[in-house]
C-alpha cells in the first residue's frame, strides 16, 4: 500500500517545543485523513531542531465511494418543505428524488446522494494548508515581506520548505504540490546547515532518512539521545570519571543538534568550593552541558561534557575553548553570589523593626535576609499579602501543629521564621529552583540546629507523587503548615483549580498533605485546621487518587469515606482493613447477605414502609431469628468498641461473626410473612444488619 512522507523544514525550533509539535502534526494529519475517508496502517513522527517529519505507511490510495439516503417530507407536503429538502440534499428538482411507500405514514421522498471517492493526493493537498496555518504553536511569528499582509502565515520560526510525497513502497512516488504563502511542497530537502547544505531529492521515508544521515542529520530524536548518552559516558569513563546523568538536559540537548558531537571541557578546581547544586545548574542552565564526578563518589569533578552540532576539523578544540571561557565566567558569577550571601547586608539599621517582629539575630546572614524579605514588603499574592505576612501565618500554624506532630516547639518556630529567608539570597535569585536547598546550606553555615536546617529545605516536600516525604518532625510540621496555609489562603480568595488549570499547584500541595499524614502516621483533624468543607472535599479527591495509586479499590474507598471525615489517616486505615475483610470468604458472604438485606429494605422504603427502630424478641418464631438477633447484638457492641479504639481489623473480625447467622436467616426465614407484625419485626431485624455493618463501612457502595 502507498506511503505518505511529509517534512516541514524551518529555522531552529526551540527544543522544548519539538516533541509536542511532532506529536501534534501526526494527530492533526491522521485525524484529517481519516475524517476524509482514508485509512492507514501506522504513522510515526520525527523531529530535529530544523524539521518536523511524518511517515504514514499503508495509506489507502483513495477514499471509498459513499452512498447516503436522506429521508424527506411526504409527497403531499407543502412547497416550502419540499424546497428545503431539495436544498439540503443538493437536488435541483424533485424528480431527482425517489418516492418510497410507507403503509402507515404514506408516500415520502428520499434523496439518494452518491459521493464518489477521492484520490489521496487531492485530499492531502486540500487539508495540509489549513493544518499548517492553524498549527498550535505556543508562540509563533511572521516574517518576510508578506508578514504584514492580513492572514500571513505564522510559524514558530520562518518556514523554509515542505516535502510531500506519496506512492507505493517499491514504485515511483509522486509529489503532492500544495502551496502556502509562496512555499510549494516538493521532493527536495536539505541536510546539515554547515556540513551538507545542498539540496537532496527524496522519494519515500526510507531513502529520506538515509539521505539525511549521509548529509549529517540524524532524524530520530531517540537515536540522537542514545548517541549523546553513550558517548558522554564513554568520554567520562576514559578520563576516570562518570557522567552525572540528567534526563531533562539530555532531552533538551538532543533538540539542539542534528549531528551530535560529544566533547569534554574543564574549569579551575577552585570553583569546586561552590555547592555542587549551583555548579550543576550554572553549567546546565547557561551552557547546556553535563557535569561529571569521580567514579563512585558524589563530589563533582572540574570536567564538564558538552554536545556540539559541528564535526570540527580541529577535533573540537576551539569549541571546547569557547565553552570553557563561558563556563568559567558563569562560575565566577556563581562564586560571587555564594560569598555575598554569606556576608552582611549593607542596610542593617533599616531592618531592626522586622528583626524584632520575628525574633531575628541581625548578626547572622540568613536572619538578615528574612528581615529584608519582610522590610521590603515583597508580595506573595495580591490578595494574600506579603511574604512577611505569610511567614507569620505559617509560624503561628506550625506552633499549633507541633503539638500534633510532637515536634520541638522552639526548633519549629526557628525553622518557620527562616523557611523563606533564602528567597532574598542572590543564589536563589539566579536559580529559583534552589529555594529551600540554599536556605539549608546557609542555615548550616551559621550554626543552626540540624533539624532547623533540614526543615528549611524539606518543608517544600513532597513536590510530587515520587518525591520523598520529610522524616524529621520539625520538617514534617513546617511542610504541613506551609501547604495548609497555601491551600486555605487560595480557597479563601476563591482561587481554586479548575479542569486542567492549577496555576498555584494546589493539587500538588493537597497531595503533599495527604502523603505526609498517611506515610508518617499523623492524626490531624483537617476541619479544625481549615474550617472549610469544600476544601475538605478537595482533600478527599486527592486522598482517593493516592489510595487508588496504592492499589485500593475505588468502591471500598467510597464505602468508608463520608463527607465529614477529616482524619485522613483513619480513613486510610479503614480502607486497608475493609480491603482485607472483603476479600476473605467471610467478608464476601457477609457482603452478599448485607446487600440482600439492604435491597429488601430499600424496596420497602421506596413503597413508603416505615421500618421500626426496635426489634421485639417476643415476635420471633424461628431459631434463625433469635440467633441473628443475638449475633447482631454482640457483634455491634464489639465492632463499635473496636472502632472507638481505632482497631478496624478487630471491628471487621467482630462483623465476620455475623456471616453464619445472616446466611441461616435468609435460608430459613421468609421476611414477607403473612402476619404484618412478624413481617415488620423481620424488616427491623434487617435494619439491624445494615446498621451493624454501617459502623465500619457503607456496604451498599461495595461492588460484588
From Swiss-Prot:
| UniProt keywords, alphabetically | Aminoacyl-tRNA synthetase, ATP-binding, Cytoplasm, Ligase, Nucleotide-binding, Protein biosynthesis
> Which Enzyme Commission number(s) are on file for it?
6.1.1.14
Q: Where in the cell is it found?
A: Cytoplasm
What this protein catalyses is: tRNA(Gly) + glycine + ATP = glycyl-tRNA(Gly) + AMP + diphosphate
UniProt key word Nucleotide-binding: yes
Under SUPFAM superfamilies, the record lists: HD-domain/PDEase-like
Give me the Gene Ontology terms describing cellular component: cytosol
Biological process terms in GO annotation: arginyl-tRNA aminoacylation; glycyl-tRNA aminoacylation
Aminoacyl-tRNA synthetase: is it a keyword of this entry? Answer: yes
Provide the top EC class.
Answer: ligase
**Which Pfam families did the record assign?**
DALR_1, tRNA_synt_2f
Disulfide pairs here are none
Q: What is the protein's major site of localization?
A: cytoplasm
The molecular function GO annotations come to: arginine-tRNA ligase activity; ATP binding; glycine-tRNA ligase activity
**Which family does the record claim for this protein?**
Belongs to the class-II aminoacyl-tRNA synthetase family.
On assembly, the entry states: Tetramer of two alpha and two beta subunits.
Please give the name of this protein: Glycine--tRNA ligase beta subunit
User: Which species is listed as the source?
Assistant: Rhizobium etli (strain ATCC 51251 / DSM 11541 / JCM 21823 / NBRC 15573 / CFN 42)
Q: Which gene encodes it?
A: glyS
